[in-house]
Curated annotation (Swiss-Prot):
Catalyzes the condensation of the acetyl group of acetyl-CoA with 3-methyl-2-oxobutanoate (2-ketoisovalerate) to form 3-carboxy-3-hydroxy-4-methylpentanoate (2-isopropylmalate). Pathway: Amino-acid biosynthesis; L-leucine biosynthesis; L-leucine from 3-methyl-2-oxobutanoate: step 1/4. Mn(2+) binds at D14, H202, H204, N238. It comes from the Bacteria. Residues 5-268 form the Pyruvate carboxyltransferase domain. Homodimer. Residues 393-518 are annotated as: Regulatory domain. It comes from Pasteurella multocida (strain Pm70). Pfam families: HCS_D2, HMGL-like, LeuA_dimer. This is 2-isopropylmalate synthase. GO terms for cellular component: cytosol. Belongs to the alpha-IPM synthase/homocitrate synthase family. LeuA type 1 subfamily.
Length: 518
């Protein structure tokens, strides 16, 4: 039995199967390099027999990866195994993963075979794969719905034929943790040659049990977990790599000191890369890598966090590669959180009136939702009764985009009460053309860090909400725009961010005047 947990990543095989559009070879290689830096022990990167494109991507990754074992999938069919071996032969180290269904439903309805036939096919497949490599994994597809006697029988036969890893998948996410743990315990205790192989688990999340089942399996003797970044995969997805890795790291008391060799500080970066390349947004409340995973909004929680981080944080954001936790300022935040944000921006309590600031903050939070640091500064130092209206407002916007030609836009705004207009040509799409026009009017330089479009409602009357993050002079500003037209909502989001920049500049000017004694 292995001393540590082997992490078998299948983002580029099982994960990619769930995508609406296939990744390019270049994109797959980019993810493979990221997985190698992350420290996965094995990466399953494709199913070579399925297409020429998959064969090419497996071969390309196998040629370039040096520190992780590269694996390819094959059915228990000679031509599949031969194709996998051909694609993998250029690798530093490789594994052939062969599988066959074992549940009565699959054997009878899909394969139209007997279980005895399936055992023979498994033996032949493992032996053929061993002609190419001494690292062969065998999987019992739909083991979660296979009788334990049959699982033990075919696992014993596969190991005798040369399998070095035996995988017990909950292919359709059917098992509950106690059931799955019992299956693994039976394999551990009833298969006489189990000491010659590693038990692997591959869980799907149809009932939301993938992580729990994988961890229960480890407690019962499994030593390899098959998983994907962000849990992407067929239907409801696979076990999420980041969840099992951080659970084992955080709760080593429950796993007898077992660990993985994953460099956890790479988790956030790899998660974001996979999300972007696969065009699969991460839900905000996703464990470990969601944008809210280390965000605290409750006033009671924020007060506890200010006093001692461990009150509401069982692992640090730094442990997955984030800089720090976020104390989100909302209407539920207390004085302690507001004071803490001001302190982190370098302000002493004597610089402002906390009671007045908190009162103004609550009014803004009720209206706006989340309040950012630059909002807090404006509340603290700008008299809201004396002209804190937006300096920049949108009057007119038109744009034109013709195939194969640069986009153009006309924008008219009101800046400090004066109407100004600008024509922009040469934009990379209508939104870019509008942004170029607005920035030309304001003279501001900024970098777009994030642009996110979501639909509010359904049908022709749906609104498009654009959320952006821009960087200006080393500081980040947020903007939100809402309109039925995407170009207009994009323009309103940028104008919203620009007004935040203007308020921040006003605060800076007030501070300079105070220092100068003016």
């Amino acid at each position: 039995m292995a001393d540590n947990i082997i992490i078998f990543d299948t983002t580029l095989r099982d994960g990619e199967q769930a995508l609406k559009a296939s990744l390019t070879v270049k994109e797959k290689l980019q993810i493979a390099f990221a997985l190698e830096r992350l420290g996965v022990d094995v990466m399953e990167v494709g199913f070579p027999i399925s297409s020429a494109g998959d064969f090419e991507s497996v071969q390309t990754i196998a040629r370039h990866i040096k520190h992780s074992r590269v694996c390819a999938l094959s059915r228990a069919v000679d031509k599949d195994i031969d194709a996998a071996a051909e694609a993998l032969k250029v690798a530093e180290a490789f594994r052939i993963h062969t599988f066959i269904a074992t549940s009565a439903l699959h054997v009878e309805a899909k394969l139209r075979r007997t279980f005895e036939d399936v055992v023979d096919m498994a033996i032949n497949a493992v032996k053929r794969a061993r002609n190419y490599t001494d690292d062969v994994e065998f999987s019992c597809e739909d083991a979660g719905r296979t009788g334990v006697d049959n699982i033990c029988r075919i696992v014993e036969a596969a190991i005798k034929a040369g399998a070095t890893t035996v995988n017990i998948p909950d292919t359709v996410g059917y098992c509950l943790p106690y059931q799955y743990g019992d299956i693994i315990a039976n394999v551990m205790n009833r298969v006489p040659n189990i000491d010659k192989a590693i038990i692997s688990v591959h869980c799907h999340n149809d009932l939301g049990m993938a992580t729990a089942n994988s961890l229960t399996a480890v407690q019962n003797g499994a030593r390899q977990i098959e998983c994907t970044i962000n849990g992407i995969g067929e239907r409801a997805g696979n076990t999420a790599l980041e969840e099992v890795v951080m659970a084992i790291k955080t709760r080593q008391d429950m796993f007898n000191g077992l660990d993985t060799r994953i460099n956890t500080q790479e988790i956030h970066r790899v998660s974001q890369m996979v999300s972007q390349l696969c065009n699969m947004p991460i839900q905000p409340n996703k464990a470990i890598v969601g944008s809210n995973a280390f965000a605290h909004s409750s006033g009671i929680h924020q007060d506890g966090m200010v006093k001692h981080k461990n009150t509401y944080e069982i692992m640090s954001p730094e442990s997955i590669g984030l800089k720090k936790e976020k104390l989100n300022l909302t209407a539920r935040s207390g004085r302690a959180a507001v004071k803490n944000h001001m302190s982190e921006m370098g302000y002493q309590e004597s610089d402002y009136d906390l009671d007045k600031l908190y009162e103004a903050f609550l009014k803004l939070a009720d209206k706006k939702g989340q309040v950012f640091d630059y909002d807090l500064e404006a509340l603290a130092f700008i008299d809201m009764q004396q002209g804190d209206e937006d300096r920049l407002t949108l009057d007119v916007i038109t744009s034109q985009c013709i195939s194969h030609l640069p986009a153009s836009a006309f924008v008219q705004v009101e800046l400090d009460g004066k109407k100004m207009s600008q024509v922009s040509n040469g934009g990379n799409g209508p939104v870019d053309a509008v942004y170029n026009a607005i920035l030309a009017i304001t003279g501001l330089e900024m970098k777009m860090l994030n642009y996110n479009l979501t639909a509010k409602g359904e049908g022709a009357e749906a609104l498009g909400q654009v959320d952006i993050v821009v960087e200006h002079e080393g500081r980040r500003f947020h903007g939100v725009g809402l309109a039925t037209d995407i170009v207009e909502s994009s323009a309103r989001a940028l104008i919203h961010a620009i007004n935040a920049i203007y308020r921040s500049q006003k605060v800076a000017d007030l501070k300079l005047h105070k220092i100068a004694g003016v």
